[in-house]
Design a protein with these regions (language model features):
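General beta-strand structural signal in soluble alpha/beta enzymes
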Residues: 79, 102-103, 132, 163-165, ...
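Conserved N-terminal catalytic core of the sugar/cofactor nucleotidyltransferase
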Residues: 9, 15-29, 37-44, 55-134, ...
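Short beta-strand segments
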Residues: 29-31, 80, 131-134, 164-168, ...
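Left-handed beta-helix
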Residues: 12, 17-24, 225-338
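Conserved core of the sugar-phosphate nucleotidyltransferase
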Residues: 142-262, 282
Length: 338
């Protein structure tokens, strides 16, 4: 009886500690991209993150949300998007509160988006650790992904640094960014030596053969203090005005202020605006079956091939002497490919 009571209490304490730990962890899903490179399936008015690309019953955005909802408290998940996609986000994620959907009035890439989200989360929880995630990635091993995310958040919680997640290249892919590993810092975490964005195929082959380069997944982590200091230093026009104009903004005031001032913010990615200009940047070696749905070529390379080395995505087709194609048809359509 006493042993059972002890085990019960031990389990309860562990659950409470785990809950307390993850309460400081936040995710911001970046869902404002136009998805032009996957035309005609993805179009500016309805880009790829809002499409059920593989016939799974969920769009890429919904899959991303559910992936993080298994790791973090749902109330700690935010979505950043463009005002043109606000209704799509609300339709596809009705469980997300309005004040957790941050809609920009104009496209300004990911750095201003992340700075704004950092400002909002900092006012909610000044001890938060944050992961920024694209909304259009494929993850084959969700258990490994969960483990890597938790380990990454624990690392940045304890260290004032920026952390990106890297995966080992499986092919010389010119459409991805590459991270060169430097000195080892802890377990699978290394200092970043350099970033290279979309090299040509010859250099991508050299990178892969060297073993020193990993693909950049676009997953970025840091504690809120480190993110805030980095954005304040490198993108001062974004955060400084938000805090100095009126640090006690309500959500509505903040949204109105951003609507008025966002067009003046620089058009810059997190990679170029923050990571490549910072000294304290690290990369974690990860292996969770990652693929980026950026281009038709990257999809072809990542997907399993069928007859004639064709990739057929949720489509009804008849193939006749066809090789090396990516085929995705609108629902209800049939095609003969020759």
């Amino acid at each position: 009886m006493a042993l059972s009571f002890f085990i019960c209490n031990f389990v309860n304490v562990k659950i409470m500690n785990d809950m307390k730990e993850t309460n400081n962890y936040y995710c911001v899903i970046l869902a404002g991209g136009k998805g032009r490179r996957l035309w005609p399936t993805s179009r500016e008015q309805h880009p790829k993150q809002f499409i059920d690309f593989f016939g799974s019953g969920q769009t890429q955005l919904q899959q991303t949300y559910e992936r993080f909802a298994k790791i973090l408290p749902k109330e700690n998940i935010f979505v950043n998007t463009n005002i043109n996609y606000l209704n799509l986000v609300k339709e596809q994620l009705p469980q997300v509160a309005d004040d957790h959907i941050m809609a920009e009035p104009i496209h300004r890439n990911t750095a201003p988006s992340a700075a704004w989200a950092t400002h909002r989360i900092r006012h909610i929880n000044p001890t938060a650790s944050i992961i920024f995630s694209p909304s259009d990635q494929t993850v084959m091993n969700e258990e490994a992904f969960k483990q890597n995310v938790i380990e990454g958040l624990q690392f940045v919680e304890e260290n004032d640094c920026l952390l990106t997640m890297g995966v080992k290249p499986t092919r010389p892919e010119p459409g991805y960014g590459y991270i060169q590993l430097g000195e080892r810092a802890a377990n699978d975490v290394y200092k970043v030596q350099s970033f290279t964005e979309k090299p040509d195929r010859e250099f991508a082959q050299v990178f892969m053969d060297s073993g020193e380069f990993y693909w950049n997944t676009g997953l970025f982590l840091a504690n809120v203090h480190c993110f805030y200091e980095s954005f304040s230093k490198l993108l001062p026009t974004v955060l400084r005005k938000l805090d100095t104009e009126n640090p006690s903004f309500s959500i509505e005031d903040e949204d109105n202020y951003v609507k008025e001032n966002f067009p003046s913010y620089p058009n810059m990615s997190i990679d170029h605006g923050i990571l490549e200009k910072s000294e304290n940047v690290y990369v974690m070696k990860c292996d969770f079956g990652w693929a980026d749905l950026g281009t038709w070529h990257s999809i072809y390379e990542a997907m399993q091939k069928g007859e004639g080395d064709n990739v057929v995505i949720d489509s009804d087709v008849i193939l006749d002497n066809s090789h090396g194609n990516v085929i995705k048809l609108p629902e209800g359509r049939m095609a003969v490919i020759n």
